[in-house]
Every structure is written in structure tokens, then in C-alpha cells.
Amino acid sequence: MTNKGKKKVNPFDRKQFYDIQAPSTFTNTYVGKTLVNKSAGTFSSTDALKGRVFEVNLGDLTLEDNAYRKVKLRADEVQGNKILTNFHGMDFTSDKLRSLVRKWQSLVEANVTVKTADDYVLRVFAIAFTKRQANQVKKTTYAQSSKLREVRKKMVEILTREVSNSTLSQLTSKLIPEVISREIEKSTQTIFPLQNVHIRKVKLLKQPKFDLGSLLALHGEASEEKGKKVAGGFKDVVLESV
């Protein structure tokens, strides 16, 4: 009696590749590919893809030297073999953060929880360091606690204003060239000069109901369904972790 071996099955035969597309806010919208099991029975591959979060180096999206920042993109819609994503957060690499911390300077951190003009609730974290003043002889640049409080108050004020007056897409456009960071650095000069001012992290806490038309517009596409609610659309969801 001979033992018949089991037929080897290639696991990739049951899987399908999808292209990941970033919003048109970025220079390079092609992120890469992702795998998912093919639809079978009650299992839907498109449903399995929705909600996936992809972490991408910002330098790959802007084709510039932004390798120290990571962007999170969330899969919101699948059309054909293409995944349409939306901004889901941003963070610094740990080695970049460590390189900023040095001796003889004060660290200033601030964070705010703000709703954008299109109802996304974000928590934005900013970081800055004191620098030597003009004609300063002393090596250290430590600031008094009262000065640090003033600087932090100004940082919170600018973060709140910039986020609340922008849509998520507009805010992303400000984050890429660090427009907000430069505004903080400029506005705090009269209080205490700063250096290495950065928006180091952005967390998405809550998102509005899903709108296909808005997503297509974000990707530079048109749709007859623009402005209509999708059947069985998402409710406001508080994300536990990012």
C-alpha cells in the first residue's frame, strides 16, 4: 500500500494584489501593493481591505528628503484593484527624535486636541528647543519656567488656530513643508528664540461619516455620487489607538 502525499497548494493562488493610492496632496500617489485573500463565499476581499492602515515614509510620497517622518494612510474605498486611502496620522522616527535632544538647551512640548474644518478630531503634538540669543556668550540656552510657559501657550494658540481653520487635506499640505512649525518659530522670537521646531506627531481620534464623493475629490477623481451618503455609511468612530 502506497502513501499518497498531499498535493501542495501555493498559498498565493488564493490571494490577490491591490494597488495602494495616496491622496493627490502628495507628489507621488503610488504607495505600493498589498495582499488579501480572494473573495469566496461570504468573505469579501474589499471589506477586508477597508480600514487597513499603511505606514509610508513621507520621503517616498514627496520625492524629497523627508525620511524622518512617517505617514499613516487608511484604506477607505476599493475600486477595481485600486485602494483609495486617506490621511490617518503622522509621526517622527525614533532616531530623529533622539538626534534633536542635546545638552545645554530647554525642551518645550505642547499638544492640542482640535477639530478640523471638515470635522476630523486630531491630537497634534509639537516639539521645540531653545537656542542661543544674538551676542550670547554663555554656552547654555536654558529658559526660565515663566518663559517656557509663555512659549507653550503661544504654540498651543497657533496649533489650535491652524488646525481648526483647515480641512484635513489643507492641514496635510501645511504639515509636509512644515508651515506651522515655521510660524511657531517666528511668533515666539520675542519671547525666547527657538530652533528645531517640529510637528512631531498627529493622531486621528475621530472621523466624520464616510463620504465617497469627498474621497474621490481628494484623489482628483469625479463621481456622480459626490455629496451623497453611502448606504450603510460609517458612524462617527472613536479610534482606540493609532
UniProtKB/Swiss-Prot annotation:
Single annotated GO MF: structural constituent of ribosome
GO CC field: cytosolic small ribosomal subunit
SS bond partners: none
Main location: cytoplasm
Subcellular location field: Cytoplasm
Pfam families: Ribosomal_S3Ae
Entry similarity comment: Belongs to the eukaryotic ribosomal protein eS1 family.
UniProt xrefs under HAMAP family: Ribosomal_eS1_euk (MF_03122)
Protein name: Small ribosomal subunit protein eS1
Native organism: Lodderomyces elongisporus (strain ATCC 11503 / CBS 2605 / JCM 1781 / NBRC 1676 / NRRL YB-4239)
